[in-house]
């Protein structure tokens, strides 16, 4: 009888372990955008890309950013905002030139898969000469990416909220980015939960703070976040930075979406990240 009891316990433990593995696999199921998601479609309504200039007291100059307004944009309607950040070798045009966010979003609108939003693509290198020229890894240029936090919060967001019909509460403000911009998004978003409820990091770079610095209070983060998205390519040499953040979040039971998908440190992964992230917003 005792032997049967031991066998039964072993069987229950085995089944429980199997279910746990299956649950983990289900949670990590890779989501890939459908064919054509990033191809222009001339039969649908399209949003508009404009260049804006704003005075940055942080940097002491006038700075540029791109802004995407959705199809059917009206000054009589108020919109949530996504701040979409570039990588260390880019500027405010990197997403536009390499990631065609306007096409991805236009297609999603046409399919009724996202809510109308304004997307701001700033220059995350907050220094007087913010062009990606010369040694982009120079200490002052790397530091400028950290300095952008103040420029974003004190200069750019107030400019957008003064000049565009946007919703101004944290639940209608998102931040996401690729590589260096992914690290910025995690650092700034998780570091300012009173300002952002939606945070996404695509292939986040080494500038990403250590998990215990990003999320010193897991319970508070769990309460305040509407969405935390972390994704990376399986061949990306920077994968360890996303992985360590995910493992910390999992250990501390902070809800988040994490996916490792086929790809390297490239726009194939980042475009899919934007596609998936945008569908979950607001």
Predicted regions span which residues?
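Non-catalytic cap/lid and distal C-terminal segments of serine-dependent acyl enzymes
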Residues: 27-282
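Bacterial Sec-dependent N-terminal signal peptides
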Residues: 1-29
């Amino acid at each position: 009888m005792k032997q049967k009891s031991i066998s039964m316990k072993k069987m229950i433990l085995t089944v429980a372990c199997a279910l746990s593995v299956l649950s983990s696999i289900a949670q990590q199921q890779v989501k890939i955008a459908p064919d054509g998601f990033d191809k222009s479609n001339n039969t649908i309504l399209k949003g508009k890309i404009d260049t804006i200039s704003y005075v940055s007291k942080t940097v002491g100059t006038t700075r540029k950013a791109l802004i995407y307004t959705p199809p059917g944009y009206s000054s009589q309607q108020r919109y949530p905002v996504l701040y979409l950040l570039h990588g260390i070798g880019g500027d405010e045009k990197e997403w536009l030139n390499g990631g065609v966010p306007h096409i991805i979003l236009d297609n999603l609108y046409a399919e009724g898969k996202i809510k109308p939003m304004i997307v701001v693509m700033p220059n995350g290198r907050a220094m007087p000469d913010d062009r990606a020229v010369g040694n982009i890894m120079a200490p002052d240029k790397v530091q400028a990416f950290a300095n952008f936090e103040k420029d974003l919060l004190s200069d750019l967001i107030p400019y957008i909220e003064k000049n565009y019909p946007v919703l101004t509460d944290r639940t209608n403000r998102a931040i996401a980015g690729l590589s260096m911009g992914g690290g910025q998004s995690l650092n700034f978003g998780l570091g300012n939960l009173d300002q952002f409820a939606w945070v996404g990091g695509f292939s986040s770079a080494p500038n990403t703070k250590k998990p215990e610095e990003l999320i010193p209070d897991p319970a508070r983060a769990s309460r305040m976040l509407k969405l935390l998205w972390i994704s990376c390519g399986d061949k990306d040499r920077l994968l360890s930075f996303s992985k360590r953040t995910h493992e910390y979040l999992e250990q501390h039971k902070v809800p988040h979406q994490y996916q490792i998908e086929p790809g390297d440190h490239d726009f194939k992964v980042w475009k899919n990240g934007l596609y998936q992230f945008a569908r979950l917003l607001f």
